[in-house]
């Protein structure tokens, strides 16, 4: 047996254990799971969410700083540069200034307009047209339309501008009326109202006043309402918003063109058992049933209808009463053509009228020769276009009544 010293020098060694459970590794039958308190778990989740929020916040802040300070790809300036340029943009938003814009949205109350400003502008329905309309589409205001507008206000709620087309149209209407006055032109005006001094006529979108003293007919204001009458401008004053017109001046010019024997174009206004009323440039003339054709006309409606356009000859003109007698009978190349072929009558109207005036001139020459036997100093007058003048001072200034002249061809 080795000595104790030898054992200590060689190291102590334990004898091998017997084949028992103690010689095997420890392996518990049940694994123990760690247990955490609910409070500790909740704190851990909360800390994780906080860290995630802080991380996202930092990402957003970094991205914003890059947008502010770092030039973007393809863009040579920063966001600050953009805001500076926008502030310096020369956009005139003063009241009364004009801007061009494109309509991009409409509704029952108006339209939204892109005028390349910081916000869209608004065009109210009442400012979309010089005439009364029910919706902006009636004035041609639809998405995609580009127009020039005038700034008339600002919406305090969102600082958007309020636009008008009507004011521009009014300016153009006044300019047009001044031009028509300078040219002394006869225009048509629709009677839309009346007061104790006269009637109100709508001309070029403006409301003109026509004093009763400047109305040639004896019609009342109620009878003239909604009718169109010829007018001339007497006063056009945009500053005072005064537009005064005269029906008498217009009628005088129109009547000067109504020479006896001349051919004019007219429109059938209405039919009566005794004839048809024809509008010849603002003056109503009567085409008597006996002057429609050489053939008998039993029903005028078989020959004419309201709205028909036709050529007629002036037979007589009573300026005092404002009555004009017309004829298509005198224009028939062959008796009955007005019933069978009215188109031919209108095509030959000038030719037939010229022939008719030549026959009148011959009759006048014969009458002059007869009168010279008794009144050598007197005579007939005939204008270059064949319009008859007075034979003596007792005859009407407008000349002879040609309704009694026999037809060129006997029926």
UniProtKB/Swiss-Prot annotation:
PROSITE patterns: S1. GO terms for biological process: translation. Pfam families: S1. Gene3D superfamilies: Nucleic acid-binding proteins (2.40.50.140). Residues 1-41 form a transit peptide. It is found in: Plastid, Chloroplast. Residues 96-166, 184-248, 261-329 form the S1 motif domain. SUPFAM superfamilies: Nucleic acid-binding proteins. InterPro entries: NA-bd_OB-fold, Ribos_protein_bS1-like, Ribosomal_protein_S1-like, S1_domain. CDD domains: S1_RPS1_repeat_ec1_hs1, S1_RPS1_repeat_ec2_hs2, S1_RPS1_repeat_hs4. It comes from the Eukaryota. GO terms for cellular component: chloroplast stroma; ribonucleoprotein complex; ribosome. GO terms for molecular function: mRNA binding; structural constituent of ribosome. The keyword Ribosomal protein applies. Keywords: Chloroplast, Plastid, Repeat, Ribonucleoprotein, Ribosomal protein, RNA-binding, Transit peptide. Component of the chloroplast ribosome (chloro-ribosome), a dedicated translation machinery responsible for the synthesis of chloroplast genome-encoded proteins, including proteins of the transcription and translation machinery and components of the photosynthetic apparatus. Actively engaged in the initiation complex formation via a strong mRNA-binding activity. Possesses a poly(A)-binding activity which might play a role as a control element in chloroplast mRNA translation. PANTHER family: 30S RIBOSOMAL PROTEIN S1 (PTHR10724), SMALL RIBOSOMAL SUBUNIT PROTEIN BS1C (PTHR10724:SF7). Belongs to the bacterial ribosomal protein bS1 family. Two different forms exist, S1 alpha and S1 beta. Component of the chloroplast small ribosomal subunit (SSU). Mature 70S chloroplast ribosomes of higher plants consist of a small (30S) and a large (50S) subunit. The 30S small subunit contains 1 molecule of ribosomal RNA (16S rRNA) and 24 different proteins. The 50S large subunit contains 3 rRNA molecules (23S, 5S and 4.5S rRNA) and 33 different proteins. This is Small ribosomal subunit protein bS1c. It comes from Spinacia oleracea (Spinach). The gene is RPS1.
